[in-house]
Curated annotation (Swiss-Prot):
Domain OBG-type G: 46-301
Keyword ATP-binding: yes
Amino acids binding ATP: N55, I56, G57, K58, S59, T60, M249
Superkingdom to which the source organism belongs: Eukaryota
UniProt GO MF annotations: ATP binding; ATP hydrolysis activity; GTP binding
Protein name: Obg-like ATPase homolog
Domain TGS as annotated: residue spans: 322-405
Keyword field: ATP-binding, GTP-binding, Nucleotide-binding
Length: 407
């Protein structure tokens, strides 16, 4: 199967289609689904990092996405050294409707953990600049927002002395490929001498080395079988991580829908990172909206005929990590619970408390489309739209669930 190629829509939420390699196949003999392996660390507490060249707006975008204030980012390379992280709310129409109906005292949306990392430069894989530290930061995250600069600004110098988005994309990809090649060569040298190392692991590592070094391709864009993928996941290779490309455009070009700056970038992504999402934005425009009240920002967007891209960016990152969420709802609290797509009911319940998994009995599940139609739990129950599900149930995006656990 392909590593990370299948595009799917997760739900009726505002989250857009994104890259996901989990596929479900249905057995002809039994009414069960078989979930294929996917590249990436499995889990519910995954994180995404903003990466790119220095001086392209990474730290400013991070502060806007996470609503944090770390001071004005400096206009010189490596202003960010140690990675910082914060959570961004994943707001969607389902969550908003539940809050509108219940008017709860406490509201907790789904959240995406985002890391701001130092700028990557040419020869970082050889240790230049912040080289090794930067690449270690990338290794610690599970997906990438790759920000590329497409705006000219004399007061913000470019480390390569000129603005060329396609060149920057190529530099970053080459550095990540070289670092993966270095890691794989070291792994094969060390583990190849050990009689305890599985032959399949060595064969997979050799093929991965041929992919990144011989073919110059990302691990995520090669084909891998279900035996190879867990091995690759254990290696935590940089080019196995899903990527969402963000293009920081000149504000005037962005507001006027100027496509010239995007053309070369889209062509490069189509050729080198097929299937990955490209989202244009203006960090300067987003920063100006960030300084306004929500009402003022809405008026500004309406007058310009252009909306903020923050929600789309956050949802794209959430989706790239293969995350979904379900809801628990009452007059006291409406909360979205983040889980990995494909999670079974006991695992989803265990996100609330470990006892919910250990003492799992069942879950009463209402599909969001039914709740949206009937507007209350009692109304859904009266028409048979509240179903009792057992431990084999796969939780779906937007499910409203009431768990039953043993005493």
């Amino acid at each position: 199967m392909r590593g990370i190629v299948t595009r799917i829509v997760l739900s009726t939420q505002k989250c857009l289609p994104s890259v996901n390699c989990t596929r479900r196949y249905y057995s002809k003999q039994k009414d069960i689904s078989i979930v294929r392996q996917r590249l990436g660390r499995p889990g519910n507490h995954l994180k995404i990092g903003i990466v790119g060249m220095p001086n392209i707006g990474k730290s400013t975008l991070f502060q806007i996405l996470t609503k944090t204030n770390l001071g004005n980012p400096a206009n010189y390379p490596f202003a960010t050294i140690d990675p910082v992280h914060a959570k961004a709310p994943v707001l969607d129409s389902q969550y908003e409707l539940l809050c509108e109906i219940y008017q709860p005292k406490t509201r907790i949306p789904a959240q995406l953990t985002i890391y701001d990392t130092a700028g990557l430069t040419r020869n970082s894989s050889k240790g230049e600049g912040l080289g090794n530290a930067f690449l270690s930061n990338i290794r610690s995250v599970d997906a990438l927002f790759q920000l590329v600069r497409a705006f000219p600004e004399a007061q913000v110098p470019h480390v390569e002395k000129s603005v060329d988005p396609v060149r920057d994309l190529q530099i970053i990809q080459e550095e990540l490929l070289l670092k993966d090649a270095e890691f794989l060569e070291s792994y094969l040298k060390k583990e190849g001498r050990s009689p305890k190392t599985c032959a399949k692991a060595l064969d997979t590592a050799r093929r991965a080395l041929e992919v990144v070094l011989g073919k110059g391709r990302q691990i995520s864009k090669a084909e891998w079988n279900d035996e190879q993928i867990p091995i690759l996941n254990s290696l935590n290779l940089l080019t196995a991580k899903p990527v969402v490309y963000l293009v920081n455009m000149d504000q005037d070009d962005y507001l006027s829908d100027e496509q010239e700056a995007l053309k070369g970038i889209k062509e490069w992504v189509e050729k080198n990172s097929f299937g990955d999402q490209v989202i244009p934005l203006s960090v300067l425009f987003e920063e100006q909206l960030f300084m306004l009240t929500p009402e003022e920002a809405a008026q500004e967007c309406a007058s310009l005929g252009k909306n903020s891209q923050l929600s789309e960016i956050i949802c794209a990152g959430y989706s790239a990590l293969n995350l979904i969420h379900y809801f628990t709802a009452s007059e006291k609290i409406v909360q979205a619970w983040t889980i990995a797509d494909g999670s079974k009911a006991p695992d989803a319940a265990g996100i609330i408390h470990s006892d919910f998994k250990k003492k799992f009995v069942a879950g009463e599940v209402i599909k969001f489309s039914d709740f949206e139609k009937y507007k209350s739990v009692d109304a859904c129950k009266s028409v048979g739209k509240c179903k009792t599900k057992g431990k084999d149930y796969t939780v779906e995006p937007g499910d409203i669930i009431f768990w039953k656990i043993a005493r």
